[in-house]
Swiss-Prot record:
SMART domains: CYCLIN. Belongs to the cyclin family. Cyclin D subfamily. The gene is 72. It comes from Saimiriine herpesvirus 2 (strain 11) (SaHV-2). One of its GO terms (biological process) is symbiont-mediated perturbation of host cell cycle progression. May be highly relevant to the process of cellular transformation and rapid T-cell proliferation effected by HVS during latent infections of T-cells in susceptible hosts. PANTHER family: CYCLINS. The keyword Transcription does not apply. This is Cyclin homolog. Keywords: Cell cycle, Cell division, Cyclin, Host-virus interaction, Modulation of host cell cycle by viral cyclin-like protein, Modulation of host cell cycle by virus.
Amino acid sequence: MADSPNRLNRAKIDSTTMKDPRVLNNLKLRELLLPKFTSLWEIQTEVTVDNRTILLTWMHLLCESFELDKSVFPLSVSILDRYLCKKQGTKKTLQKIGAACVLIGSKIRTVKPMTVSKLTYLSCDCFTNLELINQEKDILEALKWDTEAVLATDFLIPLCNALKIPEDLWPQLYEAASTTICKALIQPNIALLSPGLICAGGLLTTIETDNTNCRPWTCYLEDLSSILNFSTNTVRTVKDQVSEAFSLYDLEIL
């Protein structure tokens, strides 16, 4: 599915910037400006949340196969959900909408974005290049060009710094926790949570399940709750939800 690996699409961690406490504070403030949803795709009459799960699984495989930056998929999900809370979609057009979201997300968050022709080819020509371009334009107009968003993956390194996790573990944690977050976002109940909470759940799940050389995940629970201004019960519950959503991903692939 993918061309030759393109590691240039994944930026290195800027530890100097990530250690500045203003970065985390600004993320928490910008998070408050995101639209709040009580459920996804309320206005849709034909496509369902189950269709969303199938579409996002394809979109995630796409981003992973082409080694796009880890933030491309979460941004594509955000764009998709915001768009389909405003405009009607159909089962016939859903893949085209998803492809357009990946196209936009990759233009914003990666060095070498996906191309229209490549996305058309990967859809088995379910739509033409022109149809995809027009779909991209429709999404941009519906969102009034406000496509960027604070993402769960944006919180990862600032939180690692705030939790005093050794800097040499950051790249490994970022890679593993980003994958956990991306797979969990496919489930609609996770997408309804705030990015900071999703990040907390993804980080704790990764520490629990991967060989990260960190302390046990419970050692970070209280500090993480304090940093994000949530109760420990809330963060623990979200961690359990993310763990469950992460485990569902492989079942859906099978």
